């Protein structure tokens, strides 16, 4: 594999292991990236197995050519939030044995200054997962209202100085538009101070803008609901999160579908009916990376893996 596509997949063995790969199973890698998890799945699949990979990043689609000669593999260019639609088009609803989701931005995207995801590298303020469509971060910052910016920074970045930063951006953009990542990062560093050790003051704002531009949390909601609807009985769901917003969504989703429908006290419903409304069971506890993995790959530090299994009622 070329250096361009080199990428250390986080919690690789644990995530793929959580899928309980069957020789002839059908699996979905909803976030192909550079193919680390897909490669591991293909290595464990038999000749009659099948892997459907999904990604909206054109560079990821290019990277998928490494598996072009493998008849068990196919790549879909699109967002993982629409995975249920893709599965329906393929006539595989209820036949999927496992879904893997590695959420957030990938290392190659962060490391490529031209993608505009990182405040550590100067590049165009883009931040689109699919840079062939949609508005860029620069375009949004140029016309967003102060209240809207503050809401995004607070909601998606949990930024305590959200309103102050939004006001400063609005004041400065009238003089010079924010077109480069360095422009935005320098402004935030100048007007705020991060109280979190070893964390750049712009970290939360960059995260918030990226999540908003790409509708990431909506994509997660849609993907999780879609996964439950396409999984076969005993099919597995493995999801890696990288920050509290993502993990909260995944944790609550698994809990909600593990407990079944909530009914008012005294409502005439049988235990069997409640059981039939349960769609998932959590498999073990949340898995964190080992100290050894964090030492090899610092970006694994904040990762959390949760695994669930589709129930058969």
Curated annotation (Swiss-Prot):
UniProt-listed Enzyme Commission number(s): 2.1.1.199
Subcellular location: Cytoplasm
Molecular function as annotated in GO: rRNA (cytosine-N4-)-methyltransferase activity
Catalytic function, reaction form: cytidine(1402) in 16S rRNA + S-adenosyl-L-methionine = N(4)-methylcytidine(1402) in 16S rRNA + S-adenosyl-L-homocysteine + H(+)
Family matches, as Gene3D superfamilies: Putative methyltransferase TM0872, insert domain, Vaccinia Virus protein VP39
Chief place of localization: cytoplasm
Keyword rRNA-binding (UniProt): no
GO cellular component: cytoplasm
UniProt superkingdom: Bacteria
Gene Ontology biological process terms in this record: rRNA base methylation
Database matches in InterPro entries: RsmH, SAM-dep_MeTrfase_MraW_recog, SAM-dependent_MTases_sf
Keyword terms of this UniProt record: Cytoplasm, Methyltransferase, rRNA processing, S-adenosyl-L-methionine, Transferase
Binding site for S-adenosyl-L-methionine: 35-37, 55, 80, 102, 109
Function of the protein: Specifically methylates the N4 position of cytidine in position 1402 (C1402) of 16S rRNA.
Recorded family membership: Belongs to the methyltransferase superfamily. RsmH family.
Cited NCBIfam families: 16S rRNA (cytosine(1402)-N(4))-methyltransferase RsmH
Protein name, per record: Ribosomal RNA small subunit methyltransferase H
Species annotation: Shewanella baltica (strain OS155 / ATCC BAA-1091)
């Amino acid at each position: 594999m070329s250096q361009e596509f080199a990428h250390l997949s986080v919690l690789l063995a644990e995530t793929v292991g959580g899928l309980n790969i069957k020789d002839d199973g059908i699996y979905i890698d909803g976030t192909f990236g550079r193919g680390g998890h897909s490669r591991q799945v293909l290595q464990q699949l038999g000749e009659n197995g099948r892997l459907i990979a999904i990604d909206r990043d054109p560079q990821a689609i290019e990277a998928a050519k490494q598996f072009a000669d493998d008849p068990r593999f196919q790549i879909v260019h699109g967002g993982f939030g629409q995975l249920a639609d893709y599965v329906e088009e393929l006539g595989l609803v209820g036949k999927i044995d496992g879904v893997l989701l590695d959420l957030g931005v990938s290392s190659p995207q962060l490391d490529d200054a031209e993608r505009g995801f990182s405040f550590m590298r100067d590049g165009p303020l883009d931040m689109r997962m699919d840079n062939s469509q949609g508005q860029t971060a620069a375009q949004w910052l140029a016309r967003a209202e102060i209240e809207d910016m503050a809401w995004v920074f607070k909601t998606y970045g949990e930024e305590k100085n959200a309103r102050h930063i939004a006001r400063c951006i609005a004041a400065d953009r009238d003089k010079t538009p924010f077109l480069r990542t360095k422009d935005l990062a320098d402004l935030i560093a100048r007007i705020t101070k991060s109280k979190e050790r070893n964390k750049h003051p712009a970290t939360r704002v960059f995260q918030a803008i990226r999540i908003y531009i790409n509708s990431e949390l909506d994509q997660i909601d849609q993907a999780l609901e879609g996964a439950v609807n396409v999984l076969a009985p005993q099919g597995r769901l493995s999801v890696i999160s990288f920050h509290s917003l993502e993990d909260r969504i995944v944790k609550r989703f698994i809990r909600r579908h593990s407990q079944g429908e909530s009914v008012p006290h005294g409502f005439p419903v049988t235990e069997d009916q409640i059981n039939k409304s349960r769609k998932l069971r959590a498999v073990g506890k949340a898995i964190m990376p080992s100290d050894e993995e964090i030492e090899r790959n610092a970006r694994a530090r904040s990762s959390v893996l949760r695994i669930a299994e589709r129930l058969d009622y």
